[in-house]
Amino acid sequence: MRRLTALLAAGLVVSVVAASCGRAEARREPADSPRAASSSDATTSPQADRRLSSPLPEPDAWIPRAPDRLAPALDATTRSLRSAIDRWTTEGDVSSGEAPLDVQLLALYQQRIYRMLARDPALADDVVARLSSSVAKEARINVAAGSNLLSLASPVSRPSLIRTQPPEPPGVLLGFYREAEDRFGVAWQVLAAVNYTESKFGRVVSASSAGAQGPMQFIPSTWAAYGLGGDVHDPHDAILGAANYLHASGAPGNYRVALYHYNPVPAYVDAVMRYARQMTRDPRTFYAYYNWQVFVLTKHGELRLTGPGL
């Protein structure tokens, strides 16, 4: 039995959803497996513009609500973020320290836009219809995944009790995902999507109300069965344990069945699959999601707990 915290992906909210999980075997490759997605959809930019087209947004920069202004803002932010990620991954060190400031600020602004769109389906439809084709497909995925998880949201009564910490560098985490993929056959994008959804890549340290612990949110009994003798709080051990559990539950043959055993909530499964599919389409999205921050929903509104300016 295991259950996950509900750190809602797309930085929407933190909520706790208790669930009981078991084991099942699956025998078919799902059509929506992340491995089935083509990376040809991703827009690459080997000659990416080295200069941002506009000043970097402040951490709490105003977001326009009019679709004819919000769509260009999301389009420009996404393109600038892709270029900043290209520079970081080719000229910087993704295995040491934190992301460059431009990546952090652009990712946060993008995340805040998607939070707004996930709460307003009509606005989202209008904005996405105005986006360039290379951004629109990514936007549809992010809005849908965010909406999935928003449906599970519940307010946190005491956000001050939620403990956070800096995550491992993305290059280090990617190495852990690939090691787990090589050992258990679970796509690294699925592991990254679970890690993101459960704890924002390890930013959230607190256990869930159901007692789930660590960056992949295991309850003790499930960890004892699938944790391979490791430390549930260690990112490397937790990622391998998650891959072991997903493999035992049907992955890679049927990711949906495996994820449903991980957390038997259809909206959760849909969200994880969507984020994984987007990272398969464009691996740069992993670095964007990595820089999306922790938000919690309170009775007074949403509150950001991590990231620039705090």
Residue ranges of model-derived segments:
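Amphipathic alpha-helical interaction segments
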Residues: 105, 109, 193-196, 241, ...
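Short, conserved phosphate-binding/catalytic loop or strand-edge motifs used
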Residues: 197, 212, 219
